[in-house]
Amino acid sequence: MDGYRPGLLDRLLGGPPGARFLSQEQVKDSLARDLEVLLNTRTALPQYLLQGYPECAASILNFGLADFAGLSQSGSEDRARICSSVRQAVERHEPRLRNVEVSLAETPGTVNRIDIVISGMLWPHGANEAVSFSAALQPSSLHYSIKRGGIA
């Protein structure tokens, strides 16, 4: 095989003309873009409404994250809740990433910014490579930016 087949979103959006396969680096770039979309989407329903409906909880209906506006990065319970929510969303909606781990990183010199590190194993078509992505939430815009590797 000459590469990896593009994901559904890439095929629907009509990626580069004539590109039937992606390199491993292109897969990582695609994964970073899709993680950014996931983190910048807010769920429509609160989690407690979906507890009795596991199929709905794992569906596109539950795509995205809950709003963290009322949580504090300095509180250990809130930090754990943010990490758990991000990990669950990634595990639920990103099949190319396995063994997902999420942690909050503290970046010296930043105020009111949440930095999240998402790591796991890249898993398209049998590839097995450790990857990490950094997400930075800018409170003024409430927008996450994602980059591969270090702090965004």
Per-region residue spans from a language model:
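Immediate N-terminus of the mature polypeptide
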Residues: 1-74, 122-152
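A short, glycine/Asx- and small/polar-enriched loop/turn
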Residues: 59-61, 110-115
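Hydrophobic residues positioned within well-ordered beta-strands of beta-sheet architectures
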Residues: 100, 116-118, 131-133
